[in-house]
A protein has these predicted regions:
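N-terminal FAD cofactor-binding segment of flavoenzymes
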Residues: 132-173
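N-terminal Rossmann-fold NAD(P) dinucleotide-binding loop
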Residues: 111-112
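C-terminal helical "tail/cap" subdomain of flavin- and related membrane-associated enzymes
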Residues: 47, 56, 60, 72-75, ...
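Short beta-strand to alpha-helix junction loop
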Residues: 140-141, 182-204, 252, 269, ...
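FAD/FMN-dependent oxidoreductases across multiple families
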Residues: 310-312, 325-444
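Glycine-rich FAD pyrophosphate-binding loop
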Residues: 104, 108, 117-138
C-alpha cells in the first residue's frame, strides 16, 4: 500500500492523502477521532511510497504541514519568501547555439492542456513538472460543455473525450437545512479520469514536438531583454521567450508577488472517497444540514458536496467545506476532520463502520480580491489558479481553467507571434473581470463574520431564499450561477425578486455583508452592466475594424473584446 499526497480533485494546490490499496485487506474507520484514523491508515500504508501526480509522494505529515501553513497564513508569520526574480537587462543573453523555447510551462498537471494547444500551433514548448507528469486516481468533476473546450482547442478528439469520462450521473441537488431543495441536470455531472486525460494530452504534446522534463522543480527565473532563463533544481537551464506559471497558489513566483498579503478569503475542505454507498446515482452541488457550528473558539457554516466516483458503483466522494477569512482563531483542518467523521454519516445516511475509506482528502484554497493577477514581470504570466482566475466560491482547478483555454491559447499565440511579451501586454491576458470581482459579496455572505452575531440560520435562510427565487426565474438565472458565471440581467432579476418577495430580509443581508463591501460590490455590478452593453452593442461593430489594424493593435483590441465578453459572462452559452 502507498500513501500518496496529491492535489485535490479540482485544484492542484490542495494536498490530498490518498490511501491506495494494493491488497485485498479492507480498512474501516472505527475511531471517533480523525488523528487516530489517519494514524491507522498511515501505519497500514507503511513506508512504501510512490509519486502519484502533481504534489508527489509524502506522508501523514502532509496534514500537519498544511495546517502549519494555514496557521502561518492566519498569523502572517512565515520565514519563507518567494524566490527572487533577477530582472537583469542584457541585450544579448541568447547565444546562437542555444536551444530557445517559445514557451516553458511550469506545472504540467493543468499546464499540459495549454502547452499542447500551443505546440499544435507550431510553437516550441517545454513542460517542467516537479513529479511525474501523470494524473491522479481521483476524478475531476466538470460539465460536458467545459470538457468540450479541450476538443475546441484541438487537445482532444470527440472519441478521446468520451474515453476519459469515468462516470456520468444526473440529477444534482442544491439544498439548505430547513429550506429550499432544487434539482438540476447536466451541471458538474461528469467524473473525468485525470489518469487517462493527462496521458492522452501528454502523448499528443510529445507527438507535436513538445519536451517534458519530469521530476524537476523550478529553482529560479532570470528575466533578460531577449529571453527568460529558468534554472531547475537539478541544475538544468532552459531558455525561453515566455514562462507560463501554472504552479497554482503554491507557486514560488506567486508567493513572491503576493508576499506580505493576507488572503481575503479561504476555502477549507476535508473529505473522503469511500466504498459502501448503496444509493449512489445522484450528486450534491451544494448542501447544508446544520446551522452555524461552533468549532473551537470560532464559528463556521459547513457546506457539503458529493459525487459518485468512477472506481465502482458503490464508491462516492464527499467533501465538507467552509468559507472563512484568515483571522488567527479560525479552525484547523484537523478540527474540521473531527467534525467530518461525525457529520458525514447522517448526511449520507450510512454508518461509518459500514464504509471502506479509499482516500482521505483535505486542503485549503486561499483567494484574493486583487485577481486575476496581472503580469508582474516581463515574459512571465500566471495561468489558472496561480492567476486567481477561479471564482472565490469555487474550488478552482480543472473546471476553472478549461473555461479560459480558448481565450488564452489564441491570446498567447498572438503575443508570441508579435513578440508582445512585456508585462504590460501580458497583463491584458489576465484582465479585470467585473463578474469575477462581484462574486466576493457572495463569498462574504456565505462566511460567518466574527464581528457580528447573526442568527445561526442566517446563511441557510439567505441561500434558501436566493435559490427559491432563482428556481422561479428559471434556467437562464440558476444554471449560469451554478457554473460560476455571473451575468448582469440574471443577477438584476434575482435582486429584484428578493426585494419584492423578501423585503424584510434585506436589512439582515446588509448587516451580514457590511456597508463598505456592499459599496465595493456595487462598483463591480455597475461595471458588469457596462461590460454587457459594450459586448452586445459595441463589440460586433468593431470586429472588422480590428482585423484591419496592425498586429500589435489587433492584439490589444482582441484582448479588450475578450475582457468585455468574459467579464460580462457572455462566454457562457448554456
Amino acid at each position: 500500500m502507498n500513501l500518496l499526497v496529491k492535489p485535490m480533485v479540482c485544484c492542484p494546490q490542495r494536498f490530498v492523502v490518498h490511501l491506495c490499496t494494493h491488497s485485498t485487506k479492507t480498512y474501516h474507520v472505527t475511531s471517533k477521532h480523525q488523528n487516530k484514523i489517519m494514524e491507522k491508515l498511515v501505519g497500514a500504508a507503511g513506508g512504501n511510497q510512490a509519486a502519484g501526480g502533481a504534489g508527489g509522494a509524502s506522508s501523514y505529515e502532509a496534514l500537519k504541514k498544511l495546517d502549519q501553513q494555514w496557521l502561518q497564513m492566519r498569523s502572517m508569520t512565515t520565514t519563507t519568501q518567494g524566490m527572487m526574480m533577477i530582472a537583469t537587462r542584457k541585450n544579448k543573453r541568447r547565444q546562437e547555439e542555444e536551444q530557445v523555447f517559445d514557451a516553458v510551462v511550469c506545472g504540467g498537471t493543468l499546464g499540459v492542456f495549454l502547452a499542447t494547444a500551443l505546440a499544435l500551433k507550431g510553437m516550441k514548448v517545454a513542460i517542467v513538472e516537479r513529479g511525474p507528469l501523470r494524473g491522479r486516481v481521483q476524478e475531476w468533476n466538470v460539465s460536458r460543455k467545459e470538457l468540450r473546450e479541450l476538443v475546441k482547442i484541438g487537445v482532444l478528439t470527440d472519441a478521446e473525450l468520451e474515453d476519459v469520462i469515468a462516470v456520468e450521473f444526473n440529477p444534482s441537488r442544491v439544498g439548505f437545512d430547513g429550506g429550499t431543495e432544487v434539482w438540476v441536470k447536466d451541471i458538474l455531472n461528469l467524473g473525468v479520469s485525470p489518469e487517462k486525460l493527462i496521458a492522452t494530452c501528454k502523448k499528443r504534446f510529445l507527438g507535436a514536438g513538445g519536451v517534458v522534463l519530469e521530476g524537476m522543480g523550478v529553482s529560479k527565473v532570470n528575466v533578460f531583454d531577449d529571453a527568460a532563463v529558468v534554472l531547475l533544481d537539478d541544475g538544468t537551464t532552459l531558455v525561453s521567450r515566455l514562462i507560463l506559471d501554472v504552479m497554482g497558489n503554491s507557486s514560488p513566483i506567486v508567493r513572491q508577488i503576493r508576499w506580505g498579503q493576507r488572503p481575503d478569503g479561504v476555502c477549507l475542505v476535508v473529505g473522503t472517497c469511500a466504498r459502501g454507498f448503496e444509493n449512489n446515482s445522484t450528486s450534491d452541488l451544494i448542501y447544508t444540514r446544520t446551522p452555524v457550528t461552533q468549532v473551537g473558539s470560532s464559528k463556521t457554516q459547513y457546506f457539503w458536496e458529493a459525487f459518485p466516483a468512477g472506481s465502482g458503483p458503490r464508491d462516492r466522494t464527499t467533501y465538507m467545506f467552509t468559507y472563512l477569512d484568515a483571522t488567527p482563531n479560525r479552525p484547523s483542518l484537523e478540527q474540521m476532520l473531527e467534525d467530518y467523521w461525525d457529520l458525514m454519516p447522517p448526511y449520507q445516511g450510512i454508518k461509518l463502520e459500514d464504509v471502506e475509506i479509499l482516500r482521505v482528502l483535505f486542503g485549503l484554497f486561499p483567494t484574493y480580491r486583487s485577481s486575476p493577477l496581472p503580469a508582474a514581470f516581463d515574459r512571465i504570466l500566471q495561468v489558472g489558479d496561480a492567476s486567481g482566475i477561479q471564482s472565490p466560491i469555487s474550488f478552482g482547478g480543472f473546471a476553472a481553467i478549461t473555461r479560459h483555454l480558448s481565450r488564452l491559447s489564441s491570446g498567447l499565440m498572438d503575443a508570441l507571434e508579435s513578440d508582445l511579451l512585456d508585462k504590460e501586454n501580458l497583463a491584458l491576458l489576465n484582465p479585470y473581470l467585473p463578474n469575477l470581482s462581484g462574486v466576493w459579496m457572495y463569498q462574504r455572505a456565505m462566511s460567518v463574520q466574527l464581528d457580528i452575531n447573526p442568527s445561526p440560520d442566517f446563511i441557510n435562510n439567505l441561500l434558501s431564499i436566493n435559490f427559491q427565487c432563482m428556481e422561479k426565474l428559471g434556467d437562464p438565472v440558476i444554471r449560469p450561477f451554478l457554473q460560476d458565471v455571473i451575468q448582469f440581467v440574471p443577477q438584476a432579476k434575482l435582486l429584484i425578486s428578493i426585494m419584492v418577495n423578501k423585503p424584510l430580509f434585506i436589512p439582515q443581508i446588509l448587516q451580514q455583508v457590511g456597508f463598505l463591501p456592499l459599496l465595493d460590490w456595487t462598483r463591480h455590478f455597475i461595471a458588469l452592466a457596462a461590460y454587457s452593453v459594450l459586448w452586445l452593442a459595441i463589440a460586433p461593430s468593431l470586429l472588422s475594424w480590428v482585423e484591419s489594424l496592425p498586429k500589435e493593435k489587433q492584439y490589444v483590441w482582441r484582448r479588450q473584446l475578450e475582457a468585455w465578453q468574459y467579464g460580462s459572462g457572455f462566454d457562457y452559452n448554456g
